[in-house]
Design a protein with these regions (language model features):
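Glycan-recognition and processing domains
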Residues: 24-63, 73-78, 99, 105, ...
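Short aromatic-centered micro-motifs
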Residues: 39, 88-89, 177, 227
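Extracellular and analogous surface-interaction loops
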Residues: 55-64, 125-131, 194-203, 264-270, ...
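Bacterial N-terminal signal peptides that target proteins for export
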Residues: 2-11
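Beta-strand-rich ligand-recognition modules
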Residues: 90-153, 229-291
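Short coil-to-beta strand junction motifs in C2/discoidin
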Residues: 78-86, 217-225
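Bacterial N-terminal signal peptides
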Residues: 11-19
């Protein structure tokens, strides 16, 4: 089993063309569920499960979006940032390696382990297609402490008509992407050149993405984007896509757009500025932003 490959079956697959997640449901492990950690986060009790040496297992019914919220326990008053990682195995076949590095969040505490402190949360998202699925989380033997995990599942609903297309604050000219005879404007996002989007909430920001395929690339490929606000990383999103047979980039006939993949970001009340960046070197992603 390839432990570093991006998995084809956990692509950000939109079951409905315009959909958003409903309220999240906390998933409980089907095995190794006796061990748990209760953390106080912003005055609220939050239940986490440590990833066991034998692996932590979940049973999930799709279509749904899964959010993995992970934290790492550290020695009290340790100020430096701490790397940690874990593996996600979907349906016993596809595996993704997730890596985070965060500083200690001083406001987090534990009743069971008062001498420990905990990092800021690392958030990782996947979408699962319709049907029954299994998820297994595996830890790294070299880590001193087990990664604490909180797994949430969110269903989908229609986005509705109240939506607005946003443009990046600073950008090059938009590109016209022709799909099924319709022209849609996208904005290029490349490594080292993040886009900034200003949005006012309380709303949801949908980010539509298409990987730009060159002649040297294969029929399928993977890419990652990271969404942040200031220094806070809101989420890292992993996509797998393939060349679109029904779309083309009008200004770049020597390039082929991939099939679109998307993710959603919650926009709290007030004005916010989000950074969207591509994490894979030498890959260009075409983006479109919808606020609703």
């Amino acid at each position: 089993m390839n432990q570093i490959a991006y998995c084809n079956r956990i692509i950000f697959l939109l079951i409905f063309i315009f959909s958003i997640p409903l309220e999240a449901k906390l998933l409980k492990p089907t095995k190794s569920s006796k061990e748990k950690e209760i953390l106080m986060v912003n005055g609220k009790r939050r239940l986490y499960y440590p990833i066991s040496d034998e692996g932590t297992h979940y049973a999930v019914q799709g279509p749904t979006r899964i959010e993995f919220i992970s934290r790492y326990p550290v020695i009290k008053n340790h100020k430096k940032s701490h790397p940690f990682k874990y593996l996600i195995v979907i349906d016993g076949e596809d595996t993704v390696s997730v890596r985070h590095r965060y500083k200690v969040q001083r406001s987090i505490s534990s009743i069971q382990h008062p001498k420990h402190r905990y990092t800021y949360s690392g958030n990782y998202f996947i979408n699962l297609e319709k049907g029954s699925h299994t998820i297994e989380l595996l830890t790294d033997d070299n880590q001193k402490y087990p990664v604490l995990m909180r797994v949430l599942a969110k269903e989908f609903e229609s986005m509705g008509k109240d939506k607005k297309v946003l443009k990046p604050m600073v950008h090059k000219n938009s590109l016209d992407l022709i799909s099924d005879g319709k022209s849609i404007k996208y904005f290029e996002c490349a490594p080292g050149l993040p886009l900034q989007i200003e949005a006012t909430g309380k709303k949801t920001l949908r980010i539509l993405t298409r990987l730009q395929f060159s002649d040297s690339m294969g029929q399928e490929d993977s890419y990652r984007i990271r969404v942040s606000e200031g220094t806070k990383v809101l989420g890292t999103y992993y996509f797998n896509t393939e060349r679109s047979p029904s779309s083309q980039i009008e200004e770049r006939m020597d390039r082929v757009p991939g099939k679109w993949r998307s993710c959603e970001v919650d926009v709290p009340k007030g004005k916010h500025r989000f950074n969207i960046e591509v994490l894979d070197k030498d890959k260009v992603v075409l983006t479109r932003f919808i606020l609703y």
